[in-house]
């Protein structure tokens, strides 16, 4: 029955864990193989988030932990041994390179690291598949575009170099200091790479990241408001994108709460780790089934404070 998909919040047809023969899922495995599906938490906070909880164990922490899995929807978990909250924020695809003028997926040739000299305003970059910075005489990589981590770093570096104002405007007056600032209709752009492929950061690019960051930040701020928290003991960034973000730039752009950099941890594929734990450990399966029942689901779409934080 697809009717529940036409209303928000979406009602889950199944939210409990499933244990069934693999043949029931048409998996080409031994006829005696069993399949296990972790429980879902809410409509946009699925079994992958349950696996992240199993991997990172926030429910066993005495201090509050914030877990963020950044994607087209950011899944957010906040809490400790006393209380767990979970929500999803519609960040969109900008963090993954979509909606960015020179954006692309993380692949060889994509810029993943950026530094801008605050005096000369000249950039240097590193690309996937090459260990050298572009100012190294031996650098000969083909530069093809900007992946997610590169987008975050170049905007963070532009902020540090004062090429971007506090409200996210590329400062046209900086054109007097560098030819890399170019007029584009009524806005300006910054030329990051001027090779066979010209790569610029435009005002629209910054706006796209601002919107994505705004949705992400509104999500964890909402959960912190509900939990009555001002700080957390650690922030865990999970998923492929989270594993490649430099914590410094995540903090510069306000993607994570302020705090010591060492408290921001890249967990990598935490969902995969949790899935493997559930695969081989019956006690882990029982544990996560019990924990998920206690998670408080927060629907950002119906929370007025989410919109307030997003606008801020």
Task: List where the protein language model places each region.
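Glycine-rich phosphate-binding loop of actin/hexokinase-like ATP-binding domains
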Residues: 2-19, 51-150, 246-268
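Catalytic phosphate/nucleotide-handling subdomain of diverse soluble enzymes
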Residues: 80-85, 225-292
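Alpha/propeptide regions of enzymes that mature by internal proteolysis
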Residues: 32-49, 53-65, 125-132, 136-140, ...
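A glycine-rich phosphate-binding loop feature that marks nucleotide/adenosyl-phosphate handling sites
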Residues: 70-72, 171-181, 231-242, 291-302
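Gly/Ser/Thr-rich active-site cleft segment
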Residues: 1-29, 140-184
């Amino acid at each position: 029955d697809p009717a529940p998909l036409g209303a928000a919040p979406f009602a889950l047809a199944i939210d409990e864990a499933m244990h069934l023969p693999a043949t029931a899922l048409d998996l080409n495995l031994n006829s005696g193989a069993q399949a296990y599906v972790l429980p879902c938490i809410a409509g946009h906070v699925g079994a992958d988030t349950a696996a992240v909880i199993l991997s990172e164990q926030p429910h066993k922490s005495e201090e509050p932990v914030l877990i963020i899995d950044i994607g087209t929807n950011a899944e957010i978990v906040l809490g400790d041994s006393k209380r767990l909250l979970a929500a999803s924020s519609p960040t969109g695809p900008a963090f993954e390179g979509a909606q960015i003028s020179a954006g692309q997926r993380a692949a060889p040739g994509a810029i993943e690291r950026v530094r801008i000299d605050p005096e000369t305003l000249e950039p240097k970059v590193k690309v996937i598949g090459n260990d050298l910075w572009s100012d190294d005489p031996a650098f000969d990589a083909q530069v093809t575009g900007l992946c997610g981590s590169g987008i975050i770093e170049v905007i963070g570096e532009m902020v540090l170099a004062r090429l971007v104002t506090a409200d996210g405007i590329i400062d046209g007056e900086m054109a007097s200091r560098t030819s890399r600032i170019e007029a584009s209709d009524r806005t300006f752009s910054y030329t990051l790479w001027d090779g066979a492929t010209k790569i610029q950061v435009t005002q629209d690019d910054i706006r796209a990241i601002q919107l994505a960051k705004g949705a992400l930040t509104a999500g964890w701020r909402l959960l912190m408001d509900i939990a009555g928290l001002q700080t957390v003991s650690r922030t865990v960034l999970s998923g492929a994108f989270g594993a490649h973000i430099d914590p410094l730039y995540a903090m510069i752009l306000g993607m994570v709460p302020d705090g010591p950099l060492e408290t921001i941890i890249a967990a990598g594929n935490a969902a995969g780790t949790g899935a493997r734990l559930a695969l081989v450990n019956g006690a882990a399966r029982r544990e996560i089934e019990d924990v998920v029942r206690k998670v408080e689901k927060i629907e950002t779409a119906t929370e007025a404070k989410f919109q307030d934080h997003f606008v801020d």
